[in-house]
A protein has these predicted regions:
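Short, cysteine-centered beta-strand-loop-beta hairpins and adjacent loop/turn segments enriched
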Residues: 94-104
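A solvent-exposed, acidic/Ser-Thr-rich amphipathic alpha-helical stretch
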Residues: 3, 23-84
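Hydrophobic residues positioned within well-ordered beta-strands of beta-sheet architectures
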Residues: 74, 88-90, 108-110
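A short hydrophobic beta-strand element
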Residues: 81-94
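Short acidic-aromatic low-complexity motifs
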Residues: 1-28
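Short beta-strand edge/turn micro-motifs at domain boundaries
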Residues: 105-131
Length: 131
């Protein structure tokens, strides 16, 4: 994995989050992906389970919920790459309404491992809410 490929993947990740398109989300991840929303959570395993979680279709502990359209944005950048491992940082912003002011900002760190097709096979998210 190189820096350009990592940035392309991160941009696709943000795009998939904004679209909530099943195929776009699935294309990011290896079939046997291990995905953690928090480092100490039990992982979500497998691309189908990750997609269901992103789409708010899963009731598994730690699963995601769908955000309202146009109420969030994010920018992530790779900061370290070692072979197939990428560490990225960035921030995520949320608004209560699409036209409203930013009400929450989170600083993020992703630790990811990729396969030969640049699909993520391990994903762990760390984040903290800005004060």
């Amino acid at each position: 994995m190189d820096r350009e490929s990592a940035q392309t993947w991160l941009d696709a990740y943000t795009s998939a989050w904004k679209s909530y398109e099943r195929a776009e989300i699935a294309a990011l991840f290896a079939d046997d992906v291990v995905y953690r929303y928090h480092p100490n959570d039990d992982p979500t395993r497998g691309v189908d389970a990750v997609v269901a979680s992103w789409l708010g279709e899963s009731d598994a502990p730690g699963s995601s919920t769908r955000d309202a359209p146009d109420t969030y944005d994010a920018t992530y950048t790779p900061v370290a790459i070692d072979g197939d491992v990428v560490v990225a940082t960035g921030s995520t912003t949320y608004r209560e309404t699409p036209e409203g002011p930013v009400t929450q900002v989170f600083d993020n760190c992703f630790v990811m491992r990729f396969d030969e097709q640049d699909r993520c096979r391990e994903f762990t998210e760390y984040y903290t809410k800005r004060r």
